[in-house]
Structure formats: structure tokens, C-alpha cells
């Protein structure tokens, strides 16, 4: 039992229950049929308790659909369904058939009467409506017209057996296909005179019926089985009656057939060709572009085959057009493929353009359709999200500066709208560590070109495009990011790479002042090697040496030697301590404070004094600091992944050349300066020795007979003047250790 029978059974059972006075107590329903539920319709409850309805069926169905929120459209005169044998039944009276109840062909619908009692109480619309359609043998389709939901009501296809008298079932089918169907075309690629391929479209000689019409030839019973709605069935029957006739003046033998041939070229030429080549055939003009050919089967078949070779349609010139898509190119391509199968559509990469090849008339129709349906896609408003990143190791302000430089670049396209793939690049994070981040491929452009492209992109940026906002909270060391989800996701990907643990460098510094005699007592050959004490002299930077403590027992050990010289008074320990720096650490000086030569150093060791000068000015007092004595500064500490330490060290020995008094400020101050600086690289735990910072001290002593030694001219004969010059050299011993 199919769905239709089940629905009919449900309707009959419901009506029988409504009209029954009493129900026998012995009746048992063995099977309960489930009413079909259409998921495309609404399940809103409807009530139709009208008793015996005698009004027009169209009004009844429209009111039910309207109560559920639908509009209705009828494909035919649905009120003619109440006709019985050409009469309209209203209660006990009978009215004559009028033209208002006829089909478009002028023939009334002769359908059996249907029940007119309707009793639905709070029934779901998607169950009641399919039941009504099945009871009245109707078909429906849900369509969208603007913002309204419309139910399109039509006749359910019916089957008709049409007997034939004079022509065969195959001939009748061929004529029906040519008359009611559409000719099929094929695309052929040929070569022109320049041996270049070009595309042409030509008919295949075959025809296809619409999907609503099915015709099957029954040759054994000489009839046609037709499946269609009533309107199409009547049209097909009328057409067959027109061609199923005996030819006047000649009796068609039992082996004779009749064919309908649709002319492709000139009709007069084909007609004359058939009359000259096949005089035994009867050829008559049929419709606007067809010929009816009757005669012996073999002659008709040979004529049809020969016409397929000589009857050619005129060549349709292929025209090419370029169309620029406003919306989505994929959607427009799919639309053209569905509406115009013979039209060749070729997308041009990502440019949003389509190349259309086809007949001029077809192209004009397609372009007119695109002008109506191709609209720019609505621009979705960008959604703004916010996220807080808690930093553990890096400074929020430094990470903010790094991210702002990254997000300032357009990561999607350059000025030519070409997609730029991201490439991994080794960079330095906010703490000076080496890290790998993804940045746009610059494609070899110069900095000036990049700046010009960035300005052009900024000018072309839509109004609804916003830049990400980054706020550094110094108190909690947090980074607040506000922007689109894509921008926040990009920041979330970069933050873990920047917020990493930074290794520290512990530098043990020992500064030893050795006089000239002590240096001679050391007996060092500055070009020799003593075990693990590798010595080298570089011009202008003093003495640089690398000491390996693990090999100290095999050669010379500097630390016990310096200690022994201290006990003899030949050397003096100026500084012995350690400082700790972070890898990549920048200056420790506060912005806007006093400035001196060590302002940009990551760490400093000083032994001596400081001269502060306050210079008044219109913008405010300017404070300058001059450190004298011994100054040791460390710049740009860096720890490589393999543990290698790189430092830039600068050592200075400054001494005032003249005594500084209050009257000499703020005039020119004269200092003697001895300076050495170098960038050194050594392994974890190794020791570096720097030497060559010379200092010179001159001491003058006067002695003699009091009063007489101070007389001018002859005073030198009664006294003594002793001048002693002492030169000393500073040794700086540095041992670096990586602390993680």
C-alpha cells in the first residue's frame, strides 16, 4: 500500500466515523495508518468544521492556506473538479456547463465528485494539507515569492491509453517529441584556416519532452501510453488525432509509416528535394517548421537518414563577451550553467571576471538576466572582541611596541591585491631573545616601496575596517587587546613566542691596579700561552685573555698570583664583586633623568667620583654627570641558544687634569682619559682578562732650610725639589655564568 492509498484510507475512515450513528462494539482496527507529514510546511494548527460545503473549492482551499500563513496560486480552473459528466452539481439542482468551467482548450474537466464534508479541529497544517491534496487528486509545490510563502496548486499527472488507427506507435512518439519537446544541441570544436580551435553549437536532430510528459509506445497493441496532467493529455490527444489520418488519394499499406521531420535549413529546398528524390512519398507541410512524410517504411527511413546528412542548420556565429561579477563568481557561474547549458563560461582566476562564449541571442539573454540578479554581496559588520593577556616574563610595554609594529602591516595583500604568504623570520623579542615569527613576504620590495604600498592600502581601506588597539597595564604587567577576532587570534599566536623566560648573565668582576714594578715582576710574555691562559694583544683595545679554570692546574693561575702581589703591596684590589644582567637587557637609566656616559649601559661598575653639573635653561635645568676614576660599562648582553655569552665592554680611567674649584664651573673642564672597549664572546663559565688601562700619578715634594729655601733666585741653593712619577696598569678579570 503506497502513501496515496494510506491517505485515502485515512480520509474514508474519518468520514465514515463522522456519519456513523453508533459504532459496533465488536469492530477492531488492526492497523493504524500514519498520516503523511510534509516537513516543508508549517505545523500550525488549523480548524475546518464546515459540515457539508457546497461553495467553490478554490475558496475553501485558499482560506485554509491563508489561515496557516500561505498564499495560493492555481494552475488551472480548480472549481471544475465538481463537474460530473459535464454538469455542475449544487445540492439537488444541476447547472449547465459554461465556458468559465472549461479548460484552455475548451473541453470541460470530467472528474468524479469528491467529499464535501470537512471536519478538522486543531490539526497540524502539514498533515491536513497533504490529506486534502490527496483526496482531491491535486499536486502542490511550495515556492518563495519575495518574502511570501506561496503554495502552487496543479493537477496530478494522469495516465491515458491512446489507440492509433493509421500510423505506428513509434512514428507517433517521434512526432510528439518533435512537436512538444525541445531540440538538443551539441558543442563541436573545429579548426579554422589558421589551425586555431573554435567552438560551434549545432543541433543533434534529437528532441526531449518536458519532465511533466511521459509517452511510451505500445507497438504490439498499436497505442500510446501517456502520463501527464489533464491539460497536456488533451493537447497530446488532439495532436495525435490530427496526424493519425489516412492520406487522401492514396491508401497507406500496412507497411507504410508516417514521420514528422523538423527542417533545420530552408523548408522549400527540403520539400523539393524529397519530391525529386522520393516520388513515392507523400510530403505535406506541417506546422511552421515541420514536414509530414508518409510512405513505405524503407523509403521514409532512407529519406530521414539522407535529410540528416544534407539538411544543415545555418552556422550560428560564436560571440565572446567579458563580464565582471559584482557578487560571488562561483554563484554566477553555477547560475549560468543551470540556465544556459550550451553557454561556455570560463572564470578568469581570482579577478572576478567571466569569459562568456555563445550565440549572440543567448549572450544577450544571459547578460540581461545577470543585470537583474548579480548584486554585490552585503558587507558583514566586523565584530569587535577583547582579550587580556597576562605576561609572566616580558614587559607589557615592550611586547606592545613589538606587536604594534607587526599589526601595522597588512597581512593579506599588497597594493596589487596579490595574496602574500607569511614566511618564518628570525627576529628579536622585547627582551632581546632570538625568536622565529611569521611575517608577510615582502617579495623583495624596498623600504620606500613598502611605505608607499602601506599608504596606498591605508587610503583604500574600507570605512568599517578598524585597527587593533593594544593597551599595556604596567601595574599588572598585562596586555589588553581589542580588535576583530582575526586580529586578536594573531596576537594570541605571537604573545607566547614573545613572553618567554629570559636567561640571566652573572658577571663576576675583579679590578686590580698593578704598578709598573709589579707588572715586571709578573714576568708575563704577552705572546705566550700558559696552560689554559690564552693571551693575545689587540691594538687599541688593551690586553684580552681567555682563562679556562678546568685547566688552571696545568699552567699559570692568575688569581693566586694577584693575591700574592697584594700582600707585597705591589698591587691593589680596586673592585671585587658581581653584577647580574638579563639577556637582551637595555639601559637601566630612567628617561628624562641625569645623563652621563653610562646612560645606555645595561650594567656599570664604577670606582672613583662623580661631578654633577646643573645648567639652567629656558626649558628647565639640565643635569649632566661626569664620572671620573674607573668606569666599567657592559652593553648588549646576549645569550645564544648554545650558551655562548656575547658582551660589549667599555673601560675608562678619567682623572681631572687640573683642580676643580667653584670658580672653574661651568667653564671648560679638562680630564685625562684612558679608554678601551671591545665586544667579546665566551662560553659559560670562562674568564676574560682585560689589561692596558694606564694611569699616571706625579708627586712633587719640596724640602729645605726654612725661609731661605723660599727666597727667589737663591732659594734653590737652600732646598730640594723631588718629583716622583708612578705609572700603573689596570687588570680587569671577568667571569661570566649563565643563570636560567
Swiss-Prot record:
Single GO BP term: protein secretion
Subcellular localization, as worded in the UniProt entry: Cell envelope
GO cellular component term, pick one: cell envelope
Keyword terms, alphabetized: Signal
Database matches in InterPro entries: Bact_Secretion_Sys_Channel, NolW-like, NolW-like_sf, T2SS/T3SS_dom
Listed Pfam families: Secretin, Secretin_N
Signal sequence, start to end: 1-20
Sequence similarity: Belongs to the bacterial secretin family.
The protein's role, per its UniProt record: Could be part of the type IV piliation system (T4P). May contribute at the cohesion between the S-layer and the outer membrane by forming oligomers. Could also be the main channel through which trafficking is managed.
Name the UniProt record assigns to this protein: Probable type IV piliation system protein DR_0774
Organism: Deinococcus radiodurans (strain ATCC 13939 / DSM 20539 / JCM 16871 / CCUG 27074 / LMG 4051 / NBRC 15346 / NCIMB 9279 / VKM B-1422 / R1)
Amino acid at each position: 500500500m503506497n502513501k496515496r492509498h494510506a491517505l485515502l484510507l485515512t480520509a474514508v475512515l474519518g468520514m465514515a466515523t463522522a456519519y456513523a450513528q453508533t459504532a459496533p462494539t465488536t469492530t477492531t482496527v488492526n492497523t493504524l495508518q500514519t498520516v503523511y507529514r510534509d516537513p516543508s510546511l508549517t505545523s500550525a494548527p488549523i480548524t475546518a468544521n464546515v459540515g457539508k460545503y457546497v461553495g467553490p473549492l478554490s475558496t475553501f482551499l485558499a482560506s485554509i492556506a491563508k489561515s496557516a500563513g500561505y498564499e495560493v496560486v492555481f494552475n488551472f480552473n480548480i472549481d471544475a473538479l465538481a463537474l460530473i459528466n459535464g454538469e455542475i452539481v449544487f445540492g439537488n439542482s444541476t447547472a449547465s456547463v459554461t465556458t468559465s468551467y472549461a479548460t484552455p482548450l475548451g473541453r470541460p474537466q470530467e472528474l468524479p465528485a469528491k467529499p464535501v464534508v470537512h471536519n478538522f479541529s486543531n490539526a497540524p497544517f502539514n498533515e491536513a494539507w497533504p490529506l486534502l491534496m490527496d483526496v482531491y487528486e491535486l499536486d502542490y509545490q511550495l515556492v518563495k515569492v519575495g518574502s511570501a510563502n506561496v503554495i502552487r496548486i496543479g493537477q496530478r499527472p494522469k495516465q491515458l491509453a491512446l489507440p492509433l488507427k493509421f500510423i505506428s506507435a513509434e512514428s507517433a512518439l517521434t512526432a510528439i517529441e518533435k512537436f512538444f519537446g525541445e531540440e538538443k544541441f551539441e558543442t563541436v570544436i573545429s579548426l579554422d584556416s589558421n589551425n586555431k580551435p573554435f567552438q560551434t553549437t549545432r543541433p543533434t536532430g534529437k528532441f526531449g519532452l518536458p519532465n511533466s510528459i511521459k509517452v511510451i509506445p505500445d507497438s504490439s497493441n498499436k497505442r500510446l501510453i501517456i502520463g501527464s496532467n489533464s491539460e497536456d493529455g488533451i493537447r497530446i490527444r488532439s495532436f495525435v488525432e490530427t496526424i493519425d489520418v489516412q492520406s487522401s488519394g492514396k491508401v497507406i499499406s500496412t507497411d507504410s509509416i508516417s514521420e514528422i521531420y523538423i527542417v533545420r535549413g530552408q523548408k522549400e529546398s527540403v520539400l523539393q528535394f524529397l519530391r525529386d528524390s522520393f516520388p513515392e512519398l507523400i510530403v505535406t507541410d506541417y506546422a511552421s517548421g515541420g514536414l509530414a512524410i508518409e510512405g513505405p517504411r524503407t523509403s521514409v527511413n532512407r529519406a530521414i537518414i539522407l535529410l540528416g546528412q544534407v539538411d544543415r542548420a545555418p552556422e550560428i556565429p560564436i560571440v565572446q563577451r567579458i563580464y565582471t561579477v559584482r557578487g560571488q563568481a562561483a554563484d554566477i557561474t553555477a547560475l549560468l550553467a543551470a540556465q544556459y547549458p550550451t553557454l561556455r563560461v570560463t572564470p578568469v582566476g581570482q579577478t572576478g571576471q567571466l569569459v562568456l562564449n555563445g550565440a549572440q541571442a543567448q549572450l544577450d539573454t544571459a547578460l540581461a538576466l545577470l543585470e537583474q540578479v548579480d548584486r554585490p554581496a552585503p558587507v558583514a559588520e566586523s565584530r569587535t572582541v577583547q582579550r587580556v593577556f597576562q605576561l609572566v616574563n616580558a614587559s607589557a610595554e615592550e611586547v606592545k611596541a613589538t606587536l604594534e609594529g607587526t599589526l601595522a602591516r597588512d597581512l593579506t595583500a599588497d597594493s596589487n591585491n596579490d595574496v602574500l604568504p607569511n614566511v618564518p623570520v628570525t627576529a628579536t623579542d622585547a627582551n632581546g631573545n632570538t625568536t622565529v615569527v611569521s611575517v608577510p613576504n615582502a617579495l623583495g620590495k624596498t623600504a620606500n616601496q613598502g611605505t608607499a604600498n602601506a599608504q596606498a592600502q591605508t587610503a583604500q581601506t574600507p570605512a568599517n575596517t578598524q585597527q587593533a588597539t593594544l593597551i599595556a597595564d604596567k601595574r599588572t604587567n598585562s596586555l589588553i587587546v581589542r580588535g576583530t577576532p582575526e586580529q586578536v587570534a594573531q596576537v594570541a599566536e605571537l604573545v607566547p613566542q614573545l613572553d618567554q623566560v629570559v636567561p640571566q648573565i652573572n658577571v663576576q668582576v675583579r679590578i686590580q691596579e698593578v704598578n709598573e714594578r709589579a707588572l715586571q715582576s709578573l714576568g708575563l710574555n704577552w705572546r705566550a700561552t700558559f696552560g689554559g691562559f690564552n693571551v693575545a694583544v689587540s691594538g687599541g683595545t688593551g690586553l684580552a685573555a681567555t682563562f679556562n679554570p678546568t685547566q688552571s692546574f696545568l699552567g699559570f693561575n692568575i688569581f693566586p698570583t694577584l693575591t700574592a702581589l697584594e700582600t707585597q703591596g705591589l698591587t691593589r684590589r680596586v673592585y671585587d664583586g658581581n653584577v647580574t644582567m638579563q639577556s637582551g637587557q637595555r639601559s637601566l637609566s630612567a628617561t628624562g633623568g641625569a645623563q652621563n656616559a653610562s646612560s645606555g649601559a645595561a650594567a656599570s661598575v664604577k670606582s672613583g667620583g662623580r661631578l654633577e653639573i646643573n645648567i639652567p635653561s629656558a626649558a628647565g635645568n639640565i643635569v649632566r654627570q661626569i664620572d671620573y676614576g674607573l668606569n666599567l660599562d657592559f652593553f648588549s648582553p646576549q645569550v645564544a641558544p648554545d650558551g655562548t655569552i656575547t658582551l660589549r665592554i667599555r673601560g675608562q680611567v678619567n682623572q681631572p687634569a687640573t683642580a676643580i674649584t667653584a670658580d672653574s664651573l661651568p667653564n671648560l673642564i679638562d680630564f685625562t682619559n684612558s679608554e678601551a672597549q671591545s665586544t667579546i664572546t665566551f662560553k659559560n663559565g670562562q674568564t676574560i682578562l682585560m689589561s692596558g688601562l694606564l694611569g699616571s700619578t706625579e708627586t712633587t715634594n719640596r724640602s729645605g732650610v726654612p725661609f731661605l729655601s723660599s727666597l727667589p733666585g737663591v732659594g734653590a741653593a737652600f732646598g730640594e725639589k723631588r718629583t716622583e712619577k708612578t705609572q700603573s696598569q689596570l687588570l680587569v678579570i671577568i667571569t661570566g655564568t649563565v643563570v636560567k
